[in-house]
Swiss-Prot record:
Residues 1554-1566, 1640-1659 have a biased composition (Polar residues). Residues 556-612 form the FHA domain. One of its GO terms (biological process) is embryo development ending in birth or egg hatching. It comes from Mus musculus (Mouse). This is Kinesin-like protein KIF1B. Has a plus-end-directed microtubule motor activity and functions as a motor for transport of vesicles and organelles along microtubules.
Length: 1816
C-alpha cells in the first residue's frame, strides 16, 4: 500500500473575446509553483498567494518563455499517471474550474496535433507503450467506456441503444458502478479517437454569457487497462488491471455571471450541486488527513458525503481511495471573474491535502470470480433455507453460470404483474409457459426442467412473493450472475460486441439521414457523390443547406411522425399530411437512377412553383415545396455530372437558387404579381383616404356653420336682454320696502352673520397675490438674498395680537362694529441671515416688490468689486428683511371672542407708568435708555456706500436696501393671563398659568400671586427681585372703559347667539343646527334681563348688595400682584424678563429684571412685587369679575432655527397633533378619459343625503385560475385604512362594492368609467407632476340581489387592472423596505335622474412583493397570541365612507349675481422670471385657512382651560361658602366659553350637561329641585331644555311591521366562493325624519328571553336575509317632483374621514329579523359615526350609522312591555336598530356615547328619583 497526496496543478488561460471586449485586467500572477491573485475591488489589499505542485502560465502567447503548452502539461501530469497505470495502480485525472476557464481544452484539446489535451495524448502514448512492450510473455487488452452525468442522471455516450438514463448501483465487492454501461474493446489509438469523437458530439453543451460552448454535463472517460504475463516456468499467468479515469467537469458558475435562465438555470443548479458536493468531499477528506489526534475512533465529523451527488459517488475510489489522483484547476485571469477564480484556488488548495492509499491491482479477475462464486453459493443456501431449493437446483456439469439467472429473472419480471392481478381476483392465472422453454433450454437449469410437469411458473412466483426476503435474494442473484457473465466474457467476444455496437451506431445514423464516410471515420454531414438527396432552403441564409435527406433505393416516404406507417423523412406543420408524398428511386435499363415524386391525396406539393397532383420525374436542381413552409432543392449528383459533360459550356445561373428564388417562382407560377398587387392595394387606399377626407371636410364645414348660427343667436339674445335691463332701470325707481322692527332685526342678524364668513375672501387674497409672492422669492434667489416669503394668516387675539400696520385701513374703520376680530392675510418673511421672522401686509409686499424689481434690473450695473460680506454688519431697510425680535414671544393664555385693543400691537416692551414717585419708573427708564442706546449702536442703517451691503443694495440714494428691515434685540416668548375674581371676596390665590406662544404652543409656566392688601402693608422680603416701595395708581374710568374696544359684548355674552362666534367659512355650525333669528332675538332679550353687557352698557341691578364692603363704589382699594417664578422655558431664550399690564391700559406696563436662563435646575425666581391702588368703580368691579391682566415674557433668542435648518419654503406650519389632518389627505378625482369634461356645477338645495359604505378589493390571479383578493394589512388600527400586499407581475382585478340604505331617489344605473392614476411613493399628491391616467376595462357591474324587503342596496362592479400599462417603476419593481406606493382611483357612476355622473375617489396604499413571496397579514401585538381575524378572506378589503348628496342645480341668477360669483384666477401657476430656481416651492393655498382655524381652536381651548382652572381654584379656596355672586359672575362666562367654532351643538350640550352634573349645589348655589329661586334667564333656559328633553316624536305608526333589526352582521355572499357582501342592515321602521316609538313593536318578535340566552355569533351565509317591508309614509322627492325636475339633480359625493377619538367600543346585541334571537357584534363609536364589526378582531367595517342624522330612543315603558332590559333603539331615516347592553352601567355608557343629551336626561331622572344613590 502506498500513500500519496493528490497532485494539484493550476493553469491560467488567455483572455477570451468577452473579456477582451470588456477591457478586463489580469489579476493572476505566477512565480514558480506559487500563484497569487489580486483583489480588483481593493487593489491596496495584499495579494492572496497559494502554493501548488504545478503552476502553468498559459495567459500569453507561445513565444513567451514562461508559456505552458499542452505538451508541458501532459509531460508533467499525464506521463506520470500513465506510468502508474503500467505499474498496476488506478489513475484519475480531473479538471476543475468555472465555466469557460479552459477545463475541456486542458483535458480534450483541439483537433490540431499540437493542441491535443491530456486525454488524447495519454491514449496515444498508451498504445505506443503497448506496441513497444508486446512479446510472447506479455499481452495487453484495453476497454473504454464514456459516460455523461447530466442533471444528476447518467447517460452512455457510446451506445446509441442506451438512450435512457442508466442506474448507478453499489456492489459489496465492486463498489459504485453504472449498470449496463458499454465497455468497448479497442485495439489501437484510432479506435479510441473515433469513440472519443463520437462521444464528444453526443455531449450536452450550450452557450452562456461566459462561454459560448459551455459544457453542461460532467464527462467521465474510463480506460480499463489489463496486463497478462505468462510465466513459462510455472505455467502460471498473472494479471494487472488498472482503471484510468479521465474526468472533464462542467463549469462551476454563478447564475448572475452566466446570465442563465430557464433550462440553463436548472442545469446550472445541478452542476453547482455536484461541484458543491465535490468541494464538501474535498474539504472533508482534507480535514480527515490533517487530523493529528491519537484517537483512532471515527468522529461524527469524519463523515464524507460521497452519496450527495452521482459524481462524487462514482469517483469515491479516486478521491481519497485506491487511486493515484491529479487535479488541474483552470483559472480565468480576468478581474470580472475574481470571485469565481478565488473560489477555485481555495478548492485546489484544500485538495492538495488529500491522502490517497493506492494499491497495485494484481490478478483482480481471479480473486473477484472466486468471491463472486462464494456469494452465489451463499445466496443459494439462503434460498434453500427458505424452501426454494427446487428452483435453484442447477446441474453444474451441464454448463457454467452464464445466463441462467438472467433468463429466470426475466421470466419472473414478465409474469410478476399478471401474478399480482391473479392474486387479487383470487383465481390462478393461466400464465403462458413459453418462458419455461427458455428456462429449460438454459444450460444451467436442468434440475428445474425436470420438474416442469409438477411446478408451473405461477406457483414458483407465488412461493417467491410469499417468502420473506425472497424477491430481494433473487434480485441480488441476478446482479451477481450478470457480473460473472461479464467477467467470463472472452476478448474475442468483447471485440465482436464492440464491432456490433459500431455497426448499430452507423446504421442508426444512416437511418436518420446523416451521412458517414465510407471508412466509418469521423461523423459529419457530407455531400454525397452518388446518392440522390434533398437539401433544405431557409429564409435565413445561414440556416440553408444544413439538413440533408437521402433518397434511398425504392420508396422514401415523407409525412408526419404520428402517421400509421413509419415515415422516412418526418416533417411537421399545419399543411403537412400524415402521409404527404413519397419518392420512388428506380434504376432504368441504361443504369441511370430515376427519382419520381408521387404526391398523396389532398397534399400541397409544388415542384418548380407548380402544384403537382400526379407523379413527376425530378431533375437535379428542382425546387420542391411541401406544405407552406418546407422548401427543398433536389440534388442528383450523377445526373448533374452527366449534364455538365453534355453541355460543358453551360453558364452558371445569374441568380442563386435559394429560398427567395423558390418563393418568387411559386408566386409567378400561381399568377400572382407582387408588384401589381401592391400598386392595386395602394390605389385602393388612396381612394379611401380621399373619400374620408372629403367627408371630414364636409362635416367640419357643417359644424362651423352651426356654431356661427348659435353664436349669432346668443349675441342677439344678449343685446335684447341688455337693452331691456337698461330700459327697466331707467324707468323704474326702487321703492323703499317698509320693514317692521322684527324684519329689520332679522335682516341685520343675517347681514352680520354672513359678513363674518371669510373663507372665500381669504382664498381670493391667497390666489390673487400668489404671483407677487413667487416673484419676490425668485428675485431673492437671483440676488442671493437670504430671505424667504410665504403666506400666513393672522387673527387679532389676546395670544396673537396683530400690529396696526398689518390691518387694512377699511378694517380699522369698521373695527368697532364687529363682534369679533377679523382674519387678515399677511406675508411671513423669514430672514435666514439674522434668524428673524417678520410679518408684512400685502400692500407692503407690493411696495417692496417695486424696489426689488428696480434692484434686480440694476443688479448688472453693480461694480465687480462689491463683496458680499454684509454678514458682518446689520442690515438697513432691505425689502427682504425686517427688524428681528431678539426677545421672542414664548406663549400667552386665554382667548376671547371680542376684539383685542390696539395696544397689543406694540411687540417691544415700553415700561411707562402713570405715577412719578415710583422707583421702578426710574429703573425702567434707565433700562429703556440703555436699550435705545444699544439699538442705535447695533442697528445702524446701512448706507449705499457701505461695502458690506448685499449685491445691488447701494443703488438707492437713501441707503435703504429694500430686502432688509431692522431687527430688535428681544423676542416675545409668550403671553399668560391671570383673572382677578378672587379680589371680589377677597381671598389670596397663587396661579400657575401657561405661557402660550402665538401658534398655541406652551413655552413654559408662570407663577403669579394676587391678593388684596391694606394700603400701608409692607411687601414680604423674598431675598431677590425688586420690591416696589411705592404704589402704582391705575384709573378705571367708566366712560373711557365703556368706549374701549375690548369691552365688546362678545367678551361677556353668555347666550348661544351664533352671530357672536368667530367664523371662518366652513368652520361654523352646520345648517341643520343654526338657530333661527327668533331664537337669537329671544336669547338677546334674556341677556338684557340677566344683567350682562350689551352694546357696551352695564346693567348693575342688584349687584351692589352682593359685593363686599371692601369694594364699595368710590372707595380706595389696594391689591398686590407678585411675579414669583417662571419655569419650563427653553434654554434658547436667555435674559428672560416679564412685564404685565391691564387690558385697557397697555401703555402702563410693569417690568421685572432680566434673569439668566440656562434651562436647568430650579425655576427662574423673579419675586417681583407690585402694589396697585385703584378707585372702585363699576368698570373696575366688572373688570376683576370677568377680565384678566396680561403677562408678557420676553427673552434674547440665542439659537435661530432658520440658520440651523433653513426651513423648506413649501413646508406649512404644523398644527397640533390633536387637530392634525388625517395621515392620507383627500385627493381630487382623477380626470376621466372617455367622458366629456365635467364642469363644476353649482349645487343648489340638497334634496336627500345618503351614507355610502364602499369596499375596495384588489384580486390577484392564483395558479388555480381564480382571482383571490390580495392580503390587506390592517395593523394601523384606524378605520377605513389598510395596505394591499401585492405580488409583482401578476394579473389583477379591482372590485368595488357600494352599500347604502334603500331610497327611491338613488338607483345606480351603470359605471361609466373607472380610472386610476397619480402613482407616487408618498401620501401627498404632487399637483405639478404629470402622470398617465389609465382607464380600466369594466367586466361586470350589477346590483347584488337581495331579499325584496332588504333595506340596504349592494352594487358591485369589477375591472381589469394591468399595472404594467402605467409604465411606472414604482408598480413594476418590488417595493423597497419601509416604502409604500399610493395610487388614486376614481369611479364615475351614472345614476337615474341625474345630469352628470357621481364620482367616488379613493387613495389606495400598496406594497409589492416578489412573485413567489409568501404573504401573510402582519399581526398586531394584541393578536400575537391569538388567532387573528385577518385570516378570513373577506377581511382583505379596504373600506371608505362617503356622503352622497342629491342636489338641485342652482339657478344661475341675475348678471349681478354671476359677477359676484366670478372665480378668482389662481395666480400661483403664472410663470415669473427665475421661477425654475425655486426648486418646486409653491405659495400656500386653501390648506392654510384650515390650518389657521386649527390653531385658533387650540388657542381657544387653552383659554377655556385657564379660565376653568381659575374658577376651580377659587371655588376650592372658598369651600362650601360659595356666594351666589360667584355663580352669577363666573358661570355664564364659563358657559359661554364652551362654545367652539368647530364643535357641534351636541358637543356643546354634552359639555354643558357635564358641567351641570358636577356638584350643582356648589357650582350654582341652589338645589336642583329649587326652581323658584332661579333668575328669569335661567328659568327660560331650563324651560327650553325641558322642552327638548320631553319632546314627543311622531307616534302615528302604532304598529311596526317587522322586527327592529333586519340583518345579521354576517357575511352575505352573492358569489359562491366569496362572502364579500357582509353587511349590517336594518329593517325600515319608517322613512320619515322622525323615529316611531318602539313600544308598540310586535310582541311575537320580542321574546321574553334575554339576548344572552339566544345570542349567537354571526356566520357567513349564501343567501340574503328575508326582510319585512314597511309602508313608506314620507313622499320622496322624485314622487313630488315633476318630470322636468328629474333631470335637474346633481350628485355630490365627498369622502368622510372618521375621527381618531373613540368615544366607546365594546359588544352590543342586535335584534335579528323575524326571530327572537340576538346577534352579538363589536361596536366602535367615532363621532359622528358608529362602526359595526363582526368581532373585536374584525378589521373591516361591516356597517355604519350616522349619529348626526339618527335618533336615539330609550323608554322604560318599552322595556317593561317586552321584558327585555337594557335596550335602546337607534332610528335613521330608513331603518331602525334595537340594541341591548350587558348591564345598566354599560347601557348608560353607550347612551352617553350615542347621545350625551339623552344620557344626561336619564341621569337627572335617576338622581331626582333616588337622591341618595350616587349619580352616574
Amino acid at each position: 500500500m502506498s500513500g500519496a497526496s493528490v497532485k494539484v496543478a493550476v493553469r491560467v488561460r488567455p483572455f477570451n473575446s468577452r473579456e477582451t471586449s470588456k477591457e478586463s485586467k489580469c489579476i493572476i500572477q505566477m512565480q514558480g509553483n506559487s500563484t497569487s491573485i489580486i483583489n480588483p475591488k481593493n487593489p491596496k489589499e495584499a495579494p492572496k498567494s497559494f502554493s501548488f505542485d504545478y503552476s502553468y502560465w498559459s495567459h500569453t502567447s507561445p513565444e513567451d518563455p514562461c508559456f505552458a503548452s499542452q505538451n508541458r502539461v501532459y509531460n508533467d501530469i499525464g506521463k506520470e499517471m500513465l506510468l502508474h497505470a503500467f505499474e498496476g495502480y488506478n489513475v484519475c485525472i480531473f479538471a476543475y474550474g468555472q465555466t469557460g476557464a479552459g477545463k475541456s481544452y486542458t483535458m480534450m484539446g483541439k483537433q490540431e496535433e499540437s493542441q491535443a489535451g491530456i486525454i488524447p495524448q495519454l491514449c496515444e502514448e498508451l498504445f505506443e507503450k503497448i506496441n513497444d512492450n508486446c512479446n510472447e510473455e506479455m499481452s495487453y487488452s484495453v476497454e473504454v467506456s464514456y459516460m455523461e452525468i447530466y442533471c444528476e442522471r447518467v447517460r452512455d455516450l457510446l451506445n446509441p441503444k442506451n438512450k435512457g438514463n442508466l442506474r448507478v448501483r453499489e456492489h459489496p465487492l465492486l463498489g459504485p458502478y453504472v449498470e449496463d454501461l458499454s465497455k468497448l474493446a479497442v485495439t489501437s489509438y484510432t479506435d479510441i479517437a473515433d469513440l472519443m469523437d463520437a462521444g464528444n458530439k453526443a455531449r450536452t453543451v450550450a452557450a452562456t454569457n461566459m462561454n459560448e460552448t459551455s459544457s453542461r454535463s460532467h464527462a467521465v472517460f474510463t480506460i480499463v487497462f489489463t496486463q497478462k504475463k505468462q510465466d513459462p516456468e510455472t505455467n502460471l499467468s498473472t494479471e494487472k488491471v488498472s482503471k484510468i479515469s479521465l474526468v472533464d467537469l462542467a463549469g462551476s458558475e454563478r447564475a448572475d455571471s452566466t446570465g442563465a435562465k430557464g433550462t440553463r438555470l436548472k442545469e446550472g443548479a445541478n452542476i453547482n450541486k455536484s461541484l458543491t458536493t465535490l468541494g464538501k468531499v474535498i474539504s472533508a477528506l482534507a480535514e480527515v488527513d490533517n487530523c493529528t489526534s491519537k484517537s483512532k475512533k471515527k468522529k461524527k465529523t469524519d463523515f464524507i458525503p460521497y452519496r450527495d451527488s452521482v459524481l462524487t459517488w462514482l469517483l469515491r475510489e479516486n478521491l481519497g481511495g485506491n487511486s493515484r489522483t491529479a487535479m488541474v484547476a483552470a483559472l480565468s485571469p480576468a478581474d470580472i471573474n475574481y470571485d469565481e477564480t478565488l473560489s477555485t484556488l481555495r478548492y485546489a488548495d484544500r485538495a492538495k491535502q488529500i491522502k490517497c492509499n493506492a494499491v497495485i491491482n494484481e490478478d483482480p479477475n481471479a480473486k473477484l470470480v472466486r468471491e463472486l462464486k462464494e456469494e452465489v453459493t451463499r445466496l443459494k443456501d439462503l434460498l434453500r433455507a427458505q424452501g426454494l431449493g427446487d428452483i435453484i437446483d442447477i446441474d453444474p456439469l451441464i454448463d457454467d453460470y452464464s445466463g441462467s439467472g438472467g433468463k429466470y429473472l426475466k421470466d419472473f419480471q414478465n409474469n410478476k404483474h399478471r401474478y399480482l392481478l391473479a392474486s387479487e381476483n383470487q383465481r390462478p392465472g393461466n400464465f403462458s409457459t413459453a418462458s419455461m422453454g427458455s428456462l429449460t433450454s438454459s444450460p444451467s437449469s436442468c434440475s428445474l426442467n425436470s420438474q416442469v410437469g409438477l411446478t408451473s411458473v405461477t406457483s414458483i412466483q407465488e412461493r417467491i412473493m410469499s417468502t420473506p426476503g425472497g424477491e430481494e435474494a433473487i434480485e441480488r442473484l441476478k446482479e451477481s450472475e450478470k457480473i460473472i457473465a461479464e467477467l467470463n466474457e472472452t476478448w474475442e467476444e468483447k471485440l465482436r460486441k464492440t464491432e456490433a455496437i459500431r455497426m448499430e451506431r452507423e446504421a442508426l445514423l444512416a437511418e436518420m439521414g446523416v451521412a458517414i464516410r465510407e471508412d466509418g471515420g469521423t461523423l459529419g454531414v457530407f455531400s454525397p457523390k452518388k446518392t440522390p438527396h434533398l437539401v433544405n432552403l431557409n429564409e435565413d441564409p445561414l440556416m440553408s443547406e444544413c439538413l440533408l435527406y437521402y433518397i434511398k433505393d425504392g420508396i422514401t416516404r415523407v409525412g408526419q411522425a404520428d402517421a400509421e406507417r413509419r415515415q422516412d423523412i418526418v416533417l411537421s406543420g399545419a399543411h403537412i399530411k400524415e402521409e404527404h408524398c413519397l419518392f420512388r428511386s428506380e434504376r432504368s435499363n441504361t443504369g441511370e437512377v430515376i427519382v419520381t415524386l408521387e404526391p398523396c391525396e389532398r397534399s400541397e406539393t409544388y415542384v418548380n412553383g407548380k402544384r403537382v397532383a400526379h407523379p413527376v420525374q425530378l431533375r437535379s436542381g428542382n425546387r420542391i415545396i411541401m406544405g407552406k413552409n418546407h422548401v427543398f432543392r433536389f440534388n442528383h449528383p450523377e445526373q448533374a455530372r452527366a449534364e455538365r459533360e453534355k453541355t460543358p459550356s453551360a453558364e452558371t445561373p445569374s441568380e442563386p437558387v435559394d429560398w427567395t428564388f423558390a418563393q418568387r417562382e411559386l408566386l409567378e407560377k400561381q399568377g400572382i404579381d407582387m408588384k401589381q398587387e401592391m400598386e392595386k392595394r395602394l390605389q385602393e387606399m388612396e381612394i379611401l383616404y380621399k373619400k374620408e377626407k372629403e367627408e371630414a371636410d364636409l362635416l367640419l364645414e357643417q359644424q362651423r356653420l352651426d356654431y356661427e348660427s348659435k353664436l349669432q343667436a346668443l349675441q342677439r339674445q344678449v343685446e335684447t336682454r341688455s337693452l331691456a335691463a337698461e330700459t327697466t332701470e331707467e324707468e323704474e325707481e326702487e321703492e323703499e320696502v317698509p320693514w317692521t322692527q322684527h324684519e329689520f332685526e332679522l335682516a341685520q342678524w343675517a347681514f352680520r352673520k354672513w359678513k363674518s364668513h371669510q373663507f372665500t375672501s381669504l382664498r381670493d387674497l391667497l390666489w390673487g397675490n400668489a404671483v407677487y409672492l413667487k416673484e419676490a422669492n425668485a428675485i431673492s434667489v437671483e440676488l442671493k438674498k437670504k430671505v424667504q416669503f410665504q403666506f400666513v394668516l393672522l387673527t387679532d387675539t389676546l395670544y396673537s395680537p396683530v400690529p396696526p400696520e398689518l390691518l387694512p385701513s377699511e378694517m380699522e374703520k369698521t373695527h368697532e362694529d364687529r363682534p369679533f376680530p377679523r382674519t387678515v392675510v399677511a406675508v411671513e418673511v423669514q430672514d435666514l441671515k439674522n434668524g428673524a421672522t417678520h410679518y408684512w401686509s400685502l400692500d407692503k409686499l407690493k411696495q417692496r416688490l417695486d424696489l426689488m424689481r428696480e434692484m434686480y434690473d440694476r443688479a448688472g450695473e453693480v461694480a465687480s468689486s462689491a463683496q458680499d460680506d454684509s454678514e458682518t454688519t446689520m442690515t438697513g431697510s432691505d425689502p427682504f428683511y425686517d427688524r428681528f425680535h431678539w426677545f421672542k414671544l414664548v406663549g400667552s393664555s386665554p382667548i376671547f371672542h371680542g376684539c383685542v385693543n390696539e395696544r397689543l400691537a406694540d411687540r417691544t416692551p415700553s415700561p411707562t407708568f402713570s405715577t412719578a414717585d415710583s422707583d421702578i419708573t426710574e429703573l425702567a427708564d434707565e433700562q429703556q435708555d440703555a436699550m435705545e442706546d444699544f439699538d442705535d449702536e447695533a442697528f445702524v442703517d446701512d448706507t449705499g456706500s457701505d461695502a458690506g451691503t448685499e449685491e445691488g443694495s447701494e443703488l438707492f440714494s437713501d441707503g435703504h436696501d429694500p430686502f432688509y428691515d431692522r431687527s430688535p434685540w428681544f423676542i416675545l416668548v409668550g403671553r399668560a393671563f391671570v383673572y382677578l375674581s378672587n379680589l371680589l371676596y377677597p381671598v389670596p390665590l397663587i396661579h400657575r398659568v401657561a405661557i402660550v406662544s402665538e401658534k398655541g404652543e406652551v413655552r413654559g409656566f408662570l407663577r403669579v400671586a394676587v391678593q388684596a392688601i391694606a394700603a400701608d402693608e409692607e411687601a414680604p422680603d423674598y431675598g431677590s427681585g425688586i420690591r416696589q416701595s411705592g404704589t402704582a395708581k391705575i384709573s378705571f374710568d367708566n366712560e373711557y372703559f365703556n368706549q374701549s374696544d375690548f369691552s365688546s359684548a362678545a367678551m361677556t355674552r353668555s347666550g348661544l347667539s351664533l352671530e357672536e362666534l368667530r367664523i371662518v367659512e366652513g368652520q361654523g355650525q352646520s345648517s341643520e343646527v343654526i338657530s333661527p333669528p327668533e331664537e337669537v332675538n329671544r336669547m338677546n332679550d334674556l341677556d338684557l334681563k340677566s344683567g350682562t353687557l350689551l352694546d357696551g352698557k352695564m346693567v348693575m341691578e342688584g349687584f351692589s348688595e352682593e359685593i363686599g364692603n371692601h369694594l364699595k363704589l368710590g372707595s380706595a382699594f389696594t391689591f398686590r400682584v407678585t411675579v414669583l417664578q417662571a419655569s419650563g422655558i427653553l434654554p434658547e431664550y436667555a435674559d428672560i424678563f416679564c412685564q404685565f399690564n391691564f387690558l385697557h391700559r397697555h401703555d402702563e406696563a410693569f417690568s421685572t429684571e432680566p434673569l439668566k436662563n440656562n434651562g436647568r435646575g430650579s425655576p427662574l425666581g423673579f419675586y417681583h412685587v407690585q402694589n396697585i391702588a385703584v378707585e372702585v368703580t363699576e368698570s373696575f368691579v366688572d373688570y376683576i369679575k370677568t377680565k384678566p391682566i396680561v403677562f408678557e415674557v420676553f427673552g434674547h433668542y440665542q439659537q435661530h432655527p432658520l440658520h440651523l435648518q433653513g426651513q423648506d419654503l413649501n413646508s406649512p406650519p404644523q398644527p397640533s397633533r390633536r387637530f392634525f389632518p388625517p395621515p392620507m389627505p383627500l385627493s381630487k378625482p382623477v380626470p376621466a378619459t372617455k367622458l366629456n369634461t365635467m364642469n363644476k356645477t353649482t349645487l343648489g338645495q340638497s334634496m336627500s343625503k345618503y351614507d355610502l359604505l364602499v369596499w375596495f378589493e384588489i384580486s390577484e390571479l392564483e395558479p388555480t385560475g381564480e382571482y383571490i383578493p390580495a392580503v390587506v394589512d390592517h395593523t394601523a388600527g384606524l378605520p377605513c385604512q389598510g395596505t394591499f400586499l401585492l405580488h409583482q407581475g401578476i394579473q389583477r382585478r379591482i372590485t368595488v362594492t357600494i352599500i347604502h340604505e334603500k331610497g327611491s331617489e338613488l338607483h345606480w344605473k351603470d359605471v361609466r368609467e373607472l380610472v386610476v392614476g397619480r402613482i407616487r411613493n408618498k401620501p401627498e399628491v404632487d399637483e405639478a407632476a404629470v402622470d398617465a391616467v389609465l382607464s380600466l376595462n369594466i367586466i361586470s357591474a350589477k346590483s347584488l340581489k337581495a331579499a325584496h324587503s332588504s333595506s340596504r342596496t349592494f352594487y358591485r362592479f369589477e375591472a381589469v387592472w394591468d399595472s404594467s400599462l402605467h409604465n411606472s417603476l414604482l408598480l413594476n419593481r418590488v417595493t423597497p423596505y419601509g416604502e409604500k406606493i399610493y395610487m388614486t382611483l376614481s369611479a364615475y357612476l351614472e345614476l337615474d335622474h341625474c345630469i352628470q355622473p357621481a364620482v367616488i375617489t379613493k387613495d389606495v396604499c400598496m406594497v409589492f412583493y416578489s412573485r413567489d413571496a409568501k404573504i401573510s397579514p402582519p399581526r398586531s401585538l394584541r393578536n400575537l397570541f391569538g388567532s387573528g381575524y385577518s385570516k378570513s378572506p373577506d377581511s382583505n378589503r379596504v373600506t371608505g365612507i362617503y356622503e352622497l348628496s342629491l342636489c338641485k342645480m342652482a339657478d344661475t341668477g341675475s348678471p349681478g349675481m354671476q359677477r359676484r360669483r366670478r372665480k378668482v384666477l389662481d395666480t400661483s401657476v403664472a410663470y415669473v422670471r427665475g421661477e425654475e430656481n425655486l426648486a418646486g416651492w409653491r405659495p400656500r393655498g386653501d390648506s392654510l385657512i384650515l390650518e389657521h382655524q386649527w390653531e385658533l381652536e387650540k388657542l381657544e381651548l387653552l383659554h377655556e382651560v385657564e379660565k376653568t382652572r381659575h374658577f376651580l381654584l377659587l371655588r376650592e379656596r372658598l369651600g362650601d361658602s360659595v356666594p351666589k355672586s360667584l355663580s352669577d359672575s363666573l358661570s355664564p362666562s364659563l358657559s359661554s366659553g364652551t362654545l367652539s367654532t368647530s364643535t357641534s351643538i351636541s358637543s356643546q350640550i354634552s359639555t354643558t350637561t357635564f358641567e351641570s352634573a358636577i356638584t350643582p349645589s356648589e357650582s350654582s348655589g341652589y338645589d336642583s329641585a329649587d326652581v323658584e329661586s332661579l333668575v328669569d334667564r335661567e328659568k327660560e333656559l331650563a324651560t327650553k331644555c325641558l322642552q327638548l328633553l320631553t319632546h314627543t316624536f311622531n307616534r302615528e305608526f302604532s304598529q311596526v311591521h317587522g322586527s327592529i333589526s333586519d340583518c345579521k352582521l354576517s357575511d352575505i355572499s352573492p358569489i359562491g366562493r366569496d362572502p364579500s357582501v357582509s353587511s349590517f342592515s336594518s329593517s325600515t321602521l319608517t322613512p320619515s325624519s322622525t323615529c316611531p316609538s318602539l313600544v308598540d313593536s310586535r310582541s311575537s318578535s320580542m321574546d321574553q328571553k334575554t339576548p344572552e340566552a339566544n345570542s349567537r355569533a354571526s356566520s357567513p351565509c349564501q343567501e340574503f336575509e328575508q326582510f319585512q317591508i314597511v309602508p313608506t309614509v314620507e313622499t320622496p322627492y322624485l314622487a313630488r317632483a315633476g318630470k322636468n325636475e328629474f333631470l335637474n339633480l346633481v350628485p355630490d359625493i365627498e369622502e368622510v374621514r372618521a375621527g381618531s377619538v373613540v368615544s366607546k367600543k365594546g359588544y352590543l346585541h342586535f335584534k335579528e329579523p323575524l326571530s327572537s334571537n340576538w346577534a352579538k357584534h363589536f361596536v366602535v363609536v367615532r363621532r359622528p359615526y358608529v362602526f359595526i364589526y363582526n368581532s373585536d378582531k374584525d378589521p373591516v367595517e361591516r356597517g355604519i350609522i350616522n349619529l348626526s342624522t339618527a335618533q336615539v330612543e330609550y323608554s322604560e315603558d318599552q322595556q317593561a312591555m317586552v321584558k327585555t332590559p337594557n335596550t335602546f333603539a337607534v332610528c335613521t331615516k330608513h331603518r331602525g336598530v334595537l340594541l341591548q347592553a350587558l348591564n345598566d352601567k354599560d347601557m348608560n355608557d353607550w347612551l352617553y356615547a350615542f347621545n350625551p343629551l339623552l344620557a344626561g336626561t336619564i341621569r337627572s331622572k335617576l338622581s331626582r328619583r333616588c337622591p341618595s344613590q350616587p349619580k352616574y
